[in-house]
Amino acid sequence: MPTPLSLQTLAKKLLATQYISKDYYFILKYCGLWWHGAPIMLSTNEDNQLMIKSASFKEGLSLDLALMKVVQENNHDLIKLFTEWGADINSSLVTVNMECTRNLCRELGAKEALNERDILQIFYKTRDIKTSSHVILCHELLSNNPLFQNIERMRSIIYRSLEKLSINFILDDISFSEMLTRHWYGLAILYNLTEAIQYFYEKYKHFKNWRLICGLSFNNLSDLYEIYNLEKVDMDIDEMMYLACSMYGGNYSTIYYCFVLGADINQAMLTSVINHHIDNLFFCIDLGADAFEESMELAKQKNHNILVHILSFKNYSPDFSLLSLKMTDPEKINALLDEEKYESKNMLMYDEFDACTNNL
């Protein structure tokens, strides 16, 4: 059972959740609710997790990450405060850099050292928060952190997450620090965190086409559109379509965009079969793909029996209402092809066929 908060700590917590006029900032300073020249604010995110906000971290940090930052800064008052508010004191060991701060963390209950499991748990927890402030600070505190360099399981997790995306570099040839940097950059694009995307883009321009690759793979058409029109892209349009089809199912927006730009929709159909992305397969058929014989052969080779059954249906046809649009505006495309709302005409036809077959 957690230790009850002291009245003083509870009062500070309550104060940090209120809107305070600038006329009363002196009260916040006096109470220690001040960080980087501005008030500390508390809020909860969509998952009901407590978030710390301040001038430098406007979109919010998790309590644990905020603790790691104040430990790095050797800010003893805020170390005590964030720990009292519920931050895991063991996460302080990720960034501790002075013996006096280490001693304070011990007094507050920190272990002598973190084991591999502790480090992995800290890493997993950091990935749950979807704000620019959080992702940027995760990169700054963790990507070059010695504690994270020699954990084999973590290396394996990051390696697998980047494996399909490493189309223009050899994964085995880059450092683990670079892998982690690409991981955080990719998360920024996956969650469409505009400020974080801009931060990574400006700082890591030498990560050739990484923003484009992630935009295609994670179905972030808004960012894909921006980067495609911002700079000269030296990636073949069919290679772009391959990324849109191969990473995840339901990548309708980026598949459609590549199709409108001239990508081979039959090749996209084959890629969807190879990667067993049924949603993408039906969408390619909606867009006029008709490589049924080659797709059937691939499905049989890979023993994808569900795909073999899907491809055995003979009455598929293009969705001409979709083909007639030929639009490139990302907002309109996203509205039309929202993964939760879009219904493939050909998938509905197959579902009817499948239901009739099962009732025979």
UniProtKB/Swiss-Prot annotation:
Source organism, top-level taxon: Viruses
GO process terms (BP): taxis
SUPFAM superfamilies reported in the protein's UniProt record: Ankyrin repeat (SSF48403)
Disulfide bond residue pairs: none
InterPro entries linked to this entry: Ankyrin_rpt-contain_sf (IPR036770), ASFV_MGF360 (IPR002595)
Function text: Plays a role in virus cell tropism, and may be required for efficient virus replication in macrophages.
Family statement: Belongs to the asfivirus MGF 360 family.
UniProt protein name: Protein MGF 360-2L
Organism from which the protein derives: African swine fever virus (isolate Warthog/Namibia/Wart80/1980) (ASFV)
